Amino acid sequence: MPHPVQLGKKVRMSYSQINEVLDMPNLIELQKEAYDWFLDEGLREVFNDISPIQDYTGNLILEFVDYSLDENPKYDVGESKERDATYAAPLKVKVRLINKETGEVKEQEVFMGDFPLMTDTGTFIINGAERVIVSQLVRSPGVYYNRQFDKTGKQLYSATVIPNRGAWLEYETDSNDVVSVRVDRTRKQPATVLLRALGYGTDQQIKDLLGEDERILATLEKDNTKTAEEGLLEIYKKLRPGEPPTIESATSLINTLFFDAKRYDLAKVGRYKFSKKLSLANRIMSHKAAENVSDPQTGEILVEEGTKIDREISLLIQNSGINEVHVYSEENKKIKVIGNHFVDIKTHIDFDIQDLKLRERVYYPVLREILDTFDSEAEIKEALKERKRELIPKHILKSDIVASINYAFNLAHEIGNVDDIDHLGNRRLRSVGELLQNQFRIGLSRMERVVKERMTIQDVDLVTPQALINIRPVAASIKEFFGSSQLSQFMDQTNPLAELTHKRRLSALGPGGLSRERAGFEVRDVHHSHYGRMCPIETPEGPNIGLINSLSSYARINEYGFIESPYRKVDKKRDVVTTDIEYLTADEEDLFIIAQANEPLDEEGKFGNKRVTSRTKFGGIDVVPFDEVDYMDVSPKQVVSVATAMIPFLENDDANRALMGSNMQRQAVPLLITDAPIIGTGMEYKAAKDSGVVVVARNSGIVDYVASNEIVVKLEDGQKDRYKLLKFKRSNQGTCINQKPIVSKGERIEAGDVIADGPSTDRGEIALGRNCLVGFMAWEGYNFEDAILINEKLVKEDALTTIHIEEYESEARDTKLGPEEITRDIPNVGEDSLKDLDERGVIRIGAEVESGDILVGKVTPKGETELTAEERLLRAIFGEKAREVRDTSLKVPHGENGIIVDIKVFTRENGDELPPGVNELVRVYIAKKKKINVGDKMAGRHGNKGVISRILPQEDMPFLEDGTPLEIVLNPLGVPSRMNIGQILEVHLGLAAKALGWKVATPVFDGANEFDIMDALEESGYPRGGKLKLQDGRTGEAFDNPVTVGYMYMLKLHHLVDDKIHARSTGPYSLVTQQPLGGKAQFGGQRFGEMEVWALEAYGAAHTLQEILTVKSDDVVGRVKTYECIVKGENIPEPGVPESFKVLIKELQSLCLDVKVLTDDDHELEIKETIDDDAGEMSLEHGDFDYGLEEPTVPEGSHITDEEEKDEDNDSEEALITEEDFEPTSVETEYAEDDDEFDGYNDFKA
């Protein structure tokens, strides 16, 4: 039975059976924690890596001592958006310069540029635009082995050693058992050459090192080198072909390639993966010892020959400092296993070393040396601190290389295992912090070069740290990262869910990641290790499928960047599932048996069933005895992401449709009247609260004052908290951001309560759409092919009305002929057009504007022409006033209208920062109410999308027996083949819940079932089947069969017909071909392609065809004359020669072919090169043929993205035939014909 649960201010009836033992984490914590780590530790790491910088003589030393970020940025978040500024704080670094000769030390605080700050909601504001840094999924550094088969079916093994940065090492075996190695992607050579270069010079040394394996012998036979020196030279020749090889240069090359921390970096995660993969313990575990193994310090026998080594003994052997053990293989051969000599420091030191942060395994030879040299605790601690870099080296060691080669040999004897690179144990996340750190490191290393150069040039006695440091490269690399990296994205702000999901997105694309073209099926596929870490459902359809994913709802990121999922621990002694939570990474999870969250437990927490369905080791699924289970899931929704967890009855939907449902919820536009879903999943409150669009109380207290734009809360200590609310602001996507209070004066609130709603929220819950009364039936074919029939009532009541705000800007610049001026005094414009402009020429707030209306009056000086005597006289009498200017006012673009809601004016005089050459900048915001319309796209939450085909009067809609008309009629044929049955269950339960006055929570995989719904229907007085009798609104007669009717949550999506519909009579033309441009953004025409031409040819419609190919397209003279004839009412003249024909001739002539055009009787036809002069005059007479008769420019600064704006500059001015155009001045860019090109743009205001 459903039970009430309190979610914020609302109570929902929940059908959940499972007690949640763990609250969901903060959903944007992954962004915030990563950035905080960067500020606290990431920056320090980079400075420590680069410091100290020495000059080439070793005399001057520059050290970075400390850094601080000023907590008071120049502009706050709101101001930064308004002024197109970056929300950033100055980074100051304390730098010390030491002169070794004189012993002089200079310290200075150096400003290192403004550093972008993260807002409270996990975003950055760069140049006034809100951006998100998406986390990147990359292959983790480590050692990877894989297995292939040759033609004869023989197993061949290969391995790759991948660092975080530095040279790769690759091993492979061939059919003849020869093991070869590639160093840094060069040609391959026998692996023994590398071993010789590392100092194992003779054949005997190599055999002693790795044992007498047949692979070793085969490789030695292939190897032409015989000594360490020859090995070095051989490797040098491969890496530096063409350079004279010497022993010194070869030795230094090997050292810088692998053993220099500046060139080769494993990072923390790489060292962790190396120690895990190559550790002795993991490899000898569960094999039989082939000899007695004794502790080298005490001589105690740890394991006897023939005994099977278990986990405990294997760790004991490893931690005692033993690095080589012989074990028996499956075929009872003696196999030598070599580890990489890393041990757990806690087994050797009994005092507390917490503060040294030596959490990982350490290199045993160094540790042994320290323990043998020092005795007292203090000395050992000091030595450990000093030699931390040697204990946990960042670069690869000889022992790592030897162990990795040995591992490859052991694989042939079934010792060790091969890796799956798509396993989430081998893929890690680079989140904001690390991406920024890498970028900062690039900037600092560029700066280091400059510093070294300046050290040599400048006077040693007078030099200061400030004079040495050039911050340009650092500032540039940060700016470049935020401004143009693939992972820095313009935030999707359509609604709160879109915002939240964007911050939790994981992308495998980007620098250092995959590319769409190269990514195969395997990378994109759902993997068993995704469980509880990455959502198997939410991913885009199309070329990015499986490359862009979403973090699961309970997942978190550990210090190494691996995704962890929480589980409840099972107490094996008492066989009780405890409430203790443990977070496991994907490779840890593979070793355990884990029960599902919906497994029944009794009061004490014991399993109800003797046999339990579980996920077994390495991704299998099986039914196991209850006493074998190690862990249990915390919640059924830990598998899926936030958006997917908001689909009720997800378990009854086909995965493909659930994917569409998850993605379409992100495209829902915020409605004017919000309405939380009747059938929710209980996720709505948490998602809204964490998305950052609602206002959350910082402290407890009593509400003191409430207005539409401010809430004041009085705290216990008499202090007051003020909360400013956002009113009608424009989001990145042009939707409307508006907050409204949901508390009243005198109300008591607690810290963390939601006190004001934002867009698409209803009393603190996400409300993306509206609950509509839906019937599934065919109606006169109007819902054929997923079309949707809606009731006119939805239009009248503004139920699906949305507000959209567009931004237009106009700037007055300095031109060669003088400055542009924003003014009301515009030539040749009637008073009627200026009625809404104020005295400075800017439109007033509240004015209603239509397409073509002037928003900002602006004039630009015209080129000086040779003046006639009369004009010179006038100029002499009236002064400069008579100088010619032309009208370049900002007008409302074609097809747009609305009400002016805001105006912002920035001028140099007021001290506003403007780009160079700009004197004044005006921004105008136009708001428009868009009612639901035929052609708009709507969808439910189950991937059931459709387009509105007809809006029917209320009286014609089918109605229930009590007279209630349906609001929406859907096609029942949309359900069976799509297999999204969740929508049907939602409709039935919605009907019952509405009647009972409930709001329901039915969590995913743990919600209401068929019988619960039938019970609810019965309780509310409806038949258990849920089908009702309907009558036809037109005739009043009952339909033959009862119909499924109920409440479904419907969303209005961002694909609105008003933004897509487009028409043109005349407009801009491409400069070279003189054909109309394409796409709505360019005010282009409809392409009449070759297939359409064939259709007209087939009909023999010769005149229509000729007209389309000439005067309607690129017959320049003809189209001007045609236009003139239409205006004057004369007959249309004969078409001329299309421009594209002339272009073809020119192209052939450029290929040195003399092309002539002949008539039937072999006379040469003269094809004019330019447009004849009368065409030019005509064009001026008839105000360049455009929509309307004004100058045909796409209005300046209309709501365009940056990319479009660049294009626009070409077209709006040059691509039109205007008076200047008879001498073309610049080359135009060809345009994408399809408007979709401009649909998903990243519109970053540069």
From Swiss-Prot:
GO BP term, example: DNA-templated transcription
Biased composition (Acidic residues): 1202-1223, 1230-1240
Matches recorded under CDD domains: RNA_pol_B_RPB2
InterPro entries reported for this sequence: DNA-dir_RNA_pol_bsu_ext_1_sf, DNA-dir_RNA_pol_bsu_external_1, DNA-dir_RNA_pol_su2, DNA-dir_RNAP_su2_dom, DNA-dir_RNAP_su2_hyb_sf, RNA_pol_bsu_bac, RNA_pol_bsu_CS, RNA_pol_bsu_protrusion
Record key words, sorted: DNA-directed RNA polymerase, Nucleotidyltransferase, Transcription, Transferase
Stretches the record annotates as Disordered: 1171-1246
Transcription in keyword set: yes
Keyword Transferase: yes
Catalyzed reactions per annotation: RNA(n) + a ribonucleoside 5'-triphosphate = RNA(n+1) + diphosphate
GO molecular function: DNA binding; DNA-directed RNA polymerase activity; ribonucleoside binding
HAMAP family per the UniProt record, alphabetical: RNApol_bact_RpoB
Function: DNA-dependent RNA polymerase catalyzes the transcription of DNA into RNA using the four ribonucleoside triphosphates as substrates.
Name by which UniProt lists this protein: DNA-directed RNA polymerase subunit beta
Recorded name of the encoding gene: rpoB
